[in-house]
Amino acid sequence: MAAKEIRFSDDARQRMMKGVNTLANAVKATLGPRGRNAVLDKSFGAPTVTKDGVSVAKEIELEDKFENMGAQMLKEVSSQTSDIAGDGTTTATVLAQAILREGMKAVAAGMNPMDLKRGIDKGVSAATKYLADELSKPCETDTSIAQVGSISANSDESVGRIIADAMQKVGKEGVITVEEGSGLENELDVVEGMQFDRGYLSPYFINNQQSMKAELEDAFILLHDKKISNIRDLLPLLENVAKANKPLLIISEDIEGEALATLVVNSIRGIVKVAAVKAPGFGDRRKAMLQDIAVLTGGTVISEEVGLSLEKATLDDLGQAKKVDVSKEETTIVGGAGRHDDIMARVEQIRAQIEESTSEYDKEKLQERVAKLAGGVAVIKVGATSEIEMKEKKARVEDALHATRAAVEEGIVPGGGTALLRAQASLDGLEYANHDQEVGINIVRRAMEEPLRQIVYNAGGDGAVVVNEVRNGEGNYGYNAQSGEYGDLVEMGILDPTKVTRTALQNAASVAALMITTEVMVADLPKDDDAGAGGGMGDMGGMGGMGGMGGMM
């Protein structure tokens, strides 16, 4: 086992603090509407330009082991905040640095770190409660949704508007994804109804030559979880569908040989207008998705597991939809005939699975299923003039989307660092057990001014002057760093999601308090390779040079 280097008390904390400051100073330059960009070198391709705090933090590794430990712990603050709220990573970093800086001073002055931590925890708990109960307002109108999106995308109003449009079209539950577009402008592509990535099994099912799709109006939908290879199983049902004079979409594990050929012939001759596709997904997920389609269309999955067979299936077992489009690669079902209550019950059931799931991949797939049942899918295609700009813009749009979802979930507070300044009121009159805990509470009070100070500093102003001016106002009164004016921030459209502000404060305090209570740090001793090589060759006299050459090869 390699020898270790051990640092104690003040020496350890100072080294850790140096690493924290290095990372925080790099990240906080990006805060606010007038924050600057960071350029990140990549091992291949063009450098990345970003104004996203967590992207900057993730790139930073320091040479000194002890400084690096501090930087890595601070990095955890921004990545945790990003994972939970999707935004607010720079704010969280600024808060953590401020709590740590003030905390280190208190520890150096001889105060008990554990009592400081208890005081910090009390202060944060009171402040987050105040944010949620007193300051937060619901975010329901399209205007406020657009404003939150704009602020998070660095005051880009077009991004805010397109996110608000997407939410309006697919509902708050719908899935909104962000992709790289091919044009210069941002575009919104909305798919209504249920869409899955399986196309027709034979091009002979196409009935619209222009769009190259099989289009079925007012169609029956047969759902089967096994392969269909024998047409005799299907004949009774096909005859009934032909009598009803409606088209039919068959979704099954597969259709092969004679069965597929017979369906194609019937379709070409116009006896039954039919299209067939494979069921989406694999294994258990396939069964679940077939069940989703059944609920959406008011049909039943014909499955031997529940004692149903194809030859005994009737028209009552079939689902119905107003319109079905089947292209080469995907199928869209619009206007399913399922009962609204059944669909909502199914959605709740899937939501319960999301809560229990531990895998991010599973959660994403379950969330997609909710969207397909409850709303639809919207794709925001980001436009830009160059690849570097495209990457930067796409990251901003994704941030804005996360922030908007957070706002819809927990509401909004006035932005620009004002909400945290107002939440200082919650720290007045808090009970504490001793003087050290009181200092802990005051550390939180001082730190809550820091995001506003930093926003003003990045805009070229004097933080202390602005903080005093905003503190003398009340409610939504704050500072607009973009225009340099004071006023009602909600009216100006400067809003932050409550969840983002709350998460930033909680995560910052959690990690900063851990660092304050650190007394010892242990790291591997740096390996001195050169000294080792030189020492080994010392006895070889004239051959030393050769030995050195050997080492070089």
From Swiss-Prot:
GO terms, biological process: protein refolding
Any idea where this protein resides?
Answer: Cytoplasm
Q: Can you tell which superkingdom this protein's organism belongs to?
A: Bacteria
Q: Name one GO molecular function term.
A: isomerase activity
Q: Does the keyword Protein biosynthesis apply?
A: no
EC assignment: 5.6.1.7
Name the family the entry cites.
Answer: Belongs to the chaperonin (HSP60) family.
Record's function text: Together with its co-chaperonin GroES, plays an essential role in assisting protein folding. The GroEL-GroES system forms a nano-cage that allows encapsulation of the non-native substrate proteins and provides a physical environment optimized to promote and accelerate protein folding.
What this protein is called in its record is: Chaperonin GroEL
Q: Which gene is this protein's source?
A: groEL
